[in-house]
């Protein structure tokens, strides 16, 4: 029987890795571990069918091998049973136990061969089979080499091992085929058919060995080495990593948890949903992490064995080679498992990140008005850019946390096994060091939470300011708003500094704890005499403590990262649980047979649920299909809220709302997406040329198209910032017309266009193109009211009157007041006495015909000039290829941190020198009998303590270097952005700037400073290790230098592609954030058109485009590290081989331990160096991107000391335009073509002209938002181009075309600089008709203003802007379409206020309403950038002037109302 099964006594001898006992026990342990994991999944499959794949049968080879395994199992079990019954009484004889264990393992192998599992189960069992076979073959080879007897069963099972290798290869091939089958399922179909799918990453089709070695990355890296990678070279994400699939799984889990009442009581449903979806795949990641931990902890034992072998009197080369083979195996397991653990955890993290980003985006599409008030656009972008993005690394930190904790425990066991009770004092000290991490972890948690709160506040303010930069520049508020951003950053920086200094002290503890603990352990050994202080013991202890130091250092960081993740989970949870729009509050259905289009009965609606008085009260409304309904009323009456009630956007308090048919919505504030004009009009619908051209003409856009360099394919900036207000409004209207909806909700669509264009839009668009549609039109243009079917008059949230035009006139009251106000404005228009209304209409028609001829001629002239077109939005710039040391030098140079950098480097050099000296002392002293243990430990402790000062200096100087750089770069970046010309903001989407202000700055804050020193530290340590190894065995330097050279080649090969991947990734992040920000601003329009699903699918594509670069970057990193580990392992194995081959006595055992201890750290140090060098190379791209914006060309200085105007300037307000020519870009055509005229002091000048004639450009030139190409502007004799911008803009007042309010309160919106008293503010409010409204609010001047003033109507926002200029009281006032969004009555009041308050001022009024400028002293008429006319309006009216034709056309548009009301 002994010959059959062998004898397995207890291991009662000294530790020997070559012993049969140890080998069989280790193999059994590994197999039992795999067995347990396998059965866990088998049990899980009984509950869920996810892991058992039906429909795919195993091949006959698997069945045959399974039968053989089962037979082998029965043999082992039978032999074991026989041994148990007939064995001897010796308790040390346990062969029957070994047989039973072997029998269980073999029968489990049989089961695993027959089970059809998912991809991950197949990988698990394949790894098990390969591990079993290789370990079995190595063990039996070792027995044969040692000359020991081999069991008969070992011979019988040898072919089984080879068959298991074959099965593992076949199993992995079948898994790859299954993955390819999955790639053609519906989930992989392109989401947007117009964008065909690229070839996916080669991982989807890679074989087992290609996956194992990351060789599937070779084609991409080879391409990147030959040329800089471009976005076209990047493959698409593999189907199983797509954002759609990730979100689908998350959404299902989320819905399940929401439906479970017990789950909703839990604090964080987002975390639970993530665990529910990704728990199972992370078990496999945990297996990799466990195997790596097991291999790392075993390495100190290998050191013990090698030193013991070198000190042995009877050295057997077979044992030496076996020890070397074990070392190779352990390093191989460590390397492969670590690389795949890192890659798999980040890949899983990427899926979580994609799922949460998409979930946050989907949520904002469903967020209620209250939810949108609680979560600003900037905050939503932050949830995506920071919180969800952080999940890409969360799983890596999580697995690091538990696996390093396990590593600490196993290392403790090894330490006790080597030195016994002597380890106890050291472990107590190590425990104390660990406990010290707890307060640090709490401090870091608090710092991180507060940092993120401060960061949210800063990014929200930054987003708001960037979106309103034009107003800020016009008002010269840059300094004040920059201080606001800097104040937010100061709060953020305070917590950043605390966090970084806390981490610096934690870093000090990490580096010092092994040194201090080792001294205490040696002291314990000496006092307790638990182990001799020889070379084996000392260097095994040092190696073990080095293994233990990694957890001590990283566990606090892991805790910090997990805490950060928990904070992000909580923030996302709060967001995803917020109120959603209640779609059941309105009933939506197809066209009704009764002909009803909109029906509201007893409707009460309120923006604020806690408000006792609803915003809209007792609304009764029934509109038939095809009716044209106008809604009018004073500012703040609730007109826009009524449209929101129809859309379901305003919370319903009571009543019913029914809408029959599809809806198209045109918002009062234009919402334009980044992209082409055509894309904005088509809005995702297929191109139908006939319908498209009809929509263009109906919205009077056909003439504008020729003004754009690329026609309707011209790229426009974010929110259409580089289009005029009229162009944006007409594009928005064309979008609605092209949509071919049933019900049209138009919110004051004509406010931003001139009277002629408004007439064209009303007649050609509303009356002709939409003649069979239902239209609800909110308007202040009274001239169109007589041509609608029904008019609703609103006051204070109620419909006070309803009926046809004539009926309402007869009723009088509110409607009569509106009409009278309009008539008062119209009747001031001077008419020649011999003109009748009929003549006027005829003149208007004749003028229109002549005007069209003029326009056509001008267009022909434009076409003949053949000026090259210029895209309004520029493609994001990025560096290409290797840029050398410039970004690194920029980082140090901008922060002026050379002194701190060299202090850090010298601190690290001093630390490494003293550490090497301390270990060399141990190696040297243990061979000298005269040196006592006290002296040995004492000198070691003194030298080690000296190194403490250096490592502390390094940690503190590094932290201060990072903080100094963060402050310098933020300051430079902020200054550059605020000083950038307006052209920069016109051509740069806000998302690009926000990406630099958020994720790039975050990298600069946290990653770059420590990356610098973490490159220096391992470089110094690597040098020290090679010097020591060369000192002991000089021959190793040959291999070491070759390995280093090869490492450099591989590293450079990798970096050529990695740099471009990171750069491209930098350009893919911004669209993701930009798209989310745009969606947040236009969510009402998106929901109204019913295009939320299309936007959602577009966003999925953007997320995938970003995710694939994260995926490839991580895969490339693992590719390079695996190869570098292999190269450095060659150096390690060479060193070990030399130590085996060198005769005994040639090298002292202490030096053997010293050399091998440094050799064991060689791979880790090189990997650490490579990883941090690559991390620094990648992170420095964020520095490069921020520095890129720090070099933006500046606009002229705010103040020029030697050119400052007198404090009383301008005392008169006279403006001279001298041959003024303006173009926006060097290659663009002239927008103003040599204008010359004079605005006399105290005059009121009206500026009129068609949309796009150059009116707004003239105002931009006056405020120097754009500099003249030639010519100049003189104010009171001073050339404004010669003085500072602040001196100019502070002396000018403007009410802009788009009224802008900022988040805060009423007081700060009226007086951002805080220079006026409350009395002055109240007086200004009274004059601008807002005092009554605000005095009724609970908080008066401190009442809140939400993002972009959304809780105030557009008209009220315009009145706030009027209040600002009333406070400033400058000598020159500009009104840029200032009354376009208010009713005629309020317009008349404002004009009266301006006449009274600015009687002695020069007032420049740009207007579309002729009555607004008709009482001006002078009128300037512009056409296509030329000054057509400039004279008194009365004189212009006496001739056949361009202005008289504009008046005539305004009369023509008002003909219905004018004829009726002039008779009243």
Curated annotation (Swiss-Prot):
Cross-referenced Gene3D superfamilies: ABC transporter type 1, transmembrane domain, P-loop containing nucleotide triphosphate hydrolases
Binding-site residues, ATP 2: 1249-1256
Broad class of where this protein is predominantly found: membrane
One GO cellular component, as annotated: cytosol
Listed CDD domains: ABC_6TM_ABCC_D1, ABC_6TM_ABCC_D2, ABCC_MRP_domain1, ABCC_MRP_domain2
UniProt note on tissues of expression: Ubiquitous.
Keywords linked to the UniProt accession: ATP-binding, Membrane, Nucleotide-binding, Repeat, Signal, Translocase, Transmembrane, Transmembrane helix, Transport
Catalytic activity: ATP + H2O + xenobioticSide 1 = ADP + phosphate + xenobioticSide 2
Signal peptide annotation: 1-22
Family of the protein in this entry: Belongs to the ABC transporter superfamily. ABCC family. Conjugate transporter (TC 3.A.1.208) subfamily.
Protein name: ABC transporter C family member 8
